């Protein structure tokens, strides 16, 4: 429900996208919806919300095993997987390590990550979700620091928080969200 309709923003590395499903994903899945022998922008335009939902459930939730994580973590990790692929798992694994878990940061969810997430969740409670959401926000800032074209996703045209930052902060408690002044200070070097 979060993802919007068709967009083909040249600054978005995902390329043509509809309901959050990128042309790259559709090509990987062989979704030639117009049956013309290739997967192109026309196929992206034909994607239905129901098809997108099925893709997300199968390939973004079940296949990477996000459904095996503690229930409190599933929404934020799933949302980030839709937005950033396996980088979301690396962020999670790094956060778990910050809580003392001894796991490999490899971008793959497996028994070590599941057990570490369960143990840390039991100890840290809601703070694990907050810590993950903060790390996610920092990931977006770091992307925008390195790639000027990505800044419009972190900062809107009026200079306030952009979609990426709002998206990350939706999953954290209010006390961990940046104030407008903190946000302005963080992005001030972007000019």
Question: What are the language-model segments listed below?
Answer:
Residues 1-191:
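Cell-wall polysaccharide-cleaving catalytic domain and substrate-binding groove, primarily
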